[in-house]
Curated annotation (Swiss-Prot):
GO molecular function, one term: C-X-C chemokine binding
Function of the molecule: Salivary chemokine-binding protein which binds to host chemokines CXCL1, CXCL2 and CXCL8.
UniProt keyword annotation of Acyltransferase present: no
One GO CC term on file: extracellular region
Endpoints of the signal sequence: 1-24
Region (Disordered): 89-110
Positions annotated as glycosylated: N48
Localization, UniProt: Secreted
Keyword ATP-binding recorded: no
Entry keywords, A to Z: Disulfide bond, Glycoprotein, Secreted, Signal
Stated name of the protein: Evasin P1166
Disulfide-linked positions: C45-C67, C49-C69, C60-C80
Length: 110
């Protein structure tokens, strides 16, 4: 009986801690050097790459040539992934007048 109660308390503690961490989120300073202004995306290209007997890897096709083979050392099979890095600190913050000007206008009916 004690083991069941102890296990239940551990599970409740892990759930509470997990919820707290999700709600708290990462702490970042929103300045231009912060990670908040950087975005690194990785997409799976839908294929794998394999090590050939001549030591080269099979080509990764797809996504208009942006796919590359990523593999762990010593492995003979890797994943074809497309990566992209965007640094939003290079772009100015839009003003509300710019946002209003870019908003779609309602259709005029005659």
């Amino acid at each position: 009986m004690e083991v069941k109660i102890f296990t239940l308390l551990q599970i409740a503690l892990f759930i509470a801690l997990g919820i707290h961490l999700v709600v708290a989120g990462p702490e970042t300073k929103e300045d231009k050097k912060s990670d908040v202004y950087e975005l690194f995306t990785v997409e799976y290209c839908g294929t794998n790459c394999t090590l050939l007997t001549n030591g080269r890897w099979t080509a990764c096709t797809g996504k208009k040539g942006t796919c590359r083979c990523y593999h762990e050392s010593g492995e003979k099979v890797g994943l074809c992934l497309s990566t992209e890095y965007t640094d939003f600190s290079e772009y100015p913050n839009p003003k509300s007048s710019e946002i209003d000007a870019a908003a779609p206008l309602p259709r005029e009916t005659h």
